[in-house]
Amino acid sequence: MINRLKTYSNLLNIQSKSFKNFLKIGIINELKKIQKIIHSNFEINFHINALKYKKPKLSSESCLIKNETYNIDIKIPMEIKYEGKIIFKKKYISFCKIPFMTEKGTFICNGNTRIIINQLIRSPGIYIKKKKNCLLATLIPKTGSWITIKRNKKKENFIKIDKINNSIPLFTFLNILGLSKKKITLSLNKNNYSKNFKISKKKKIEIPTINLTQLSKENNIKTIRNNLYNRFLNSDNYNLGDTGRFKINKKIYKTEFFTNKKILMPEDFLGIFNYMIKIKNINIKSNKIDDLKNKIVLSVGELMQNKFNNIIKDIYTKIIEKINKFEQKKKQEEKYNKEKKEEKIKINKTYFINSKNLTDNIKKFITTNPLSQLLNDLNPLSELTHKRKISTLGIGGIEKNKASTKIREIHNSHYGRICPIETSEGKNAGLVLSLAKDIRINKHGFIESPFYKVIKGNIKKNKGIFFISSENEKNIKIAPCDILKNFKLNKNYGVKNKNEFYYDSYKSINFISTSTDQFNSIGTGIIPFLEHNDANRVLMGATMQKQALILKNKEPSLIETGREILINRDSKSTIIAKESGTVIYSSSKKIIIQKKSKKSKFKNINLFKKYFKKKLKKNKKIKKHKHTIYLLNIDEKNNSNIYQTRTSIVKKNDWIKKGQIIAEGIGSLNGNLCLGKNILVGYLSWEGYNFEDAIIISERLRNEDILTSIHVKKCKSFLINHKEKKEEITKNIPDIKLKNVKNLNNNGIIKIGSKINGKEILIGIIKKRLINYEVELIYEILSEYERKNISVLSPKNLVGIVTNTKIHKIKNCYQIEIYITEKKKIQIGDKLSGRHGNKGVISKIIPIVDMPYLPDGTPIDIILNPLGIPSRMNVGQIYECLLNLSAINLKERYKIQPFDEYQYKNNSEILIYKKLNQSRKKTKKEWLFNPNNPGKTILFNGKNGKPFKQTISFGYSYILKLMHIAEEKIHAKTISNYSSIIKQPVKGKSKNGGQRFGEMEVWAIEGFGAAFLLQELLTIKSDDLHNKSQILKNLMNGLSMSKPNVPESFKLLILELQSLGLNINIFTKKKTLFTK
């Protein structure tokens, strides 16, 4: 528990802080293992204290453009001695390159933006488990073997190492470690010793790789001691880690012993045994594995340090191997060249350290690790929530297929630390979670949540905020925040103590939550009227917001919860001023701000003298740079096929304060989060078109580009730079009309700004045709050659504008990339959603004149099915819909705190009725608020102008257009690829695959009695290969169709049965149709 004044500082602080610790402490700690290597006649020294980091050669933006990796170079001074003589002087060598984290908390690897997810794993330490016949104490280290101490009913004590069946008596084990009988008896009370320490009669002891019955008596103890020393007392093979040592000290010692020892000590085993005796006497409950006090979070830095540790071990073994090879080679040379004089030994700096191999290993971790994923940057919310995910999967975590329901369930310790709502759906449910809003992670890796101090019923906000972990909740009682307004003395309140919830008096409360939505994640926290929805629908609402496309005409929501500004700030979609100053330049590429001038302490000193220059460089009060330059990202496609653009919102000579937004990203407007549009909605059934969550929309949404999104497609090609120039990019393409190449440059690449409509030439490429040598000689003499057109064409259905072209040189070839931007208007089959899990697919687009309209003649834009609300229990959409209606009429915006019912009963309803009444009075539209039917009015049918029989709910809802677009989903097989082995069409849209004529389709044709058509569909038109090849000849020559053969699919079935050992074949009267 540490006293803090602020609840949060930065939502991305977990990643950035962890990576900084890795660079400052983690790398140095790992390099200490190879600081001095002495082997044979060699002595290799790495001067770690003089370690340096070299800045990246390219900026993060240029790495994205050029498909490079954004990394830093580690430089270490290295010195090599041979037989006491220096053969390689102390010089800086390039040790390796590691990917460097950007300001956004991401890594750029091969031009792709990646993120490493936090991992939640079991904490190192002691775990007690009670069984019917015995008591088990398991010691889990950070790295090394697991140890289990078993105590049975007979009071016999054994030790097991890892998963080995044979156990070792504890007394024997302690003797081998070097503890005498006297020391064991002194550490335990005499009574405890006689009662609790019975010596086993077991004589045969087995330790991995050692069988004591096979050893002589003299070497017995020495060999075992060496084995145990290497397993548990050697820091290279065994490491408890800071957390493991902290937990052991806290459980078995009154004061912290061995704080700097990361290995097991013999005294630790005695302490654990003492602890087990106490537990047996007191009957303490066994440890709950799912409790957060038994779990730690490994962030980017810790995961990279674990990888770096493995790399260091490999380096050590390879250096020793190379030394041995060098010594063997030298001995062989000395045998043959005895008469020659001794030559100086020359060793290159790359002989022992190959920086390229080390860099590739680290790069492989970033690209192949299951916790490393491509950043989901569809919108600012999806980007931020992806960075705050926490996974129990991965290396050292839980296996997805073996995870039980107990592991997936919500635990009481999650309160205020892990969101109980937001999780992945499907197989990863309960395994991939999301961190709560205001949490932080302490130095041991435990999650802490903020609380206010309560003393004798008085809430002490002035004392600041206390961060408490699950471990520290043992002896305190915590109350929720909803008692703040109605906090009365002499009354019982709901409290949490030792992961249990019950009612207790106000005097017993020690801490209280800081806010009502403290337990929620960032995604669920921006859903207004959250408390009126079912938890499953809130989960859907959170996931739908992450799938929302940024629209062409952005619009913020009229109802917010206050977290939207934080999301824009910490997702780095906006640029924030680091210091106050005046704007002296502002454009689409950069913003320059002149800093506030400060008087120098050394104003009258002549700066031309070198002595003073060196002194002044160290003085912090002298400011070298008076201007701060903020580069706006060049238009660049992200992982989600959307342009990442930033636009300046400041002008020249504007005064800027520190922390002010100076440039906005794609998903923000005036600092507000923009994910959808406020659209007029009506809840009624309309001719069955909105049956089962289907959505009917007005033609206005399509015509006025209200739900139009912008997408980017990349087309690329490679040109090999060969001496013979077999391929060439040119505008002069044979047999192509001029109108088809009018948009190409002289280089043969399409111009920026050209319109694309269907299959058009993007890159004009010609290739030399392969001809016989005689004809080729004539072409060489005439300096001409036969040319073939292999130009790159745009996709068939792509309609857009060329916005960018790039050419990259990669070794002996050129990579040409063309970016085409297209508008995608709303259409039938597209998916829309609200913020309350109310999702659906568009079934019908209706003309404006046919849509139902309000009493003032305003046509409704979207018709939703009212039956979807009571069954799904997401009433929050109605609250939002009605409050939005009053917000538009009153021209106001609202911030609604989740769980605001604690202030007084029916708070949400009272607020909505109040605002609807105000809007009725202001606009003088009586139908806006009817006290008998609040939130409802009579709508009119657009087709005949008659009013509907009943009053209908209507209002403005914040509608999101999701990434599931019908145009991208539809796939039809025309002429596809076939598998060469099974002769069946390949699977999937990406391979242009298809399917056979299905079983239900066969039934349909059977129903119509079309026997000959069915025969053709299943044979000649499908996979009767022999007749398929003959059909064109027969049609051209006027011959009749040949009899159908057995299709390949049936032959495949026979082969499958034969592979099972069944002797099945196809026979006719004359011959076998199909042989093995």
Curated annotation (Swiss-Prot):
Subcellular location(s) per record: Plastid
Catalysed reactions, as listed in the record: RNA(n) + a ribonucleoside 5'-triphosphate = RNA(n+1) + diphosphate
Keywords: DNA-directed RNA polymerase, Nucleotidyltransferase, Plastid, Transcription, Transferase
GO MF term (any one): DNA-directed RNA polymerase activity
Disulfide bonds: none
GO cellular component: DNA-directed RNA polymerase complex; mitochondrion; plastid
EC class (word): transferase
One GO-annotated biological process of the protein: DNA-templated transcription
Subunit structure: In plastids the minimal PEP RNA polymerase catalytic core is composed of four subunits: alpha, beta, beta', and beta''. When a (nuclear-encoded) sigma factor is associated with the core the holoenzyme is formed, which can initiate transcription.
Protein function: DNA-dependent RNA polymerase catalyzes the transcription of DNA into RNA using the four ribonucleoside triphosphates as substrates.
Family listed: Belongs to the RNA polymerase beta chain family.
Protein name: DNA-directed RNA polymerase subunit beta
Species annotation: Euglena longa (Euglenophycean alga)
Top-level taxonomy: Eukaryota, Discoba, Euglenozoa, Euglenida, Spirocuta
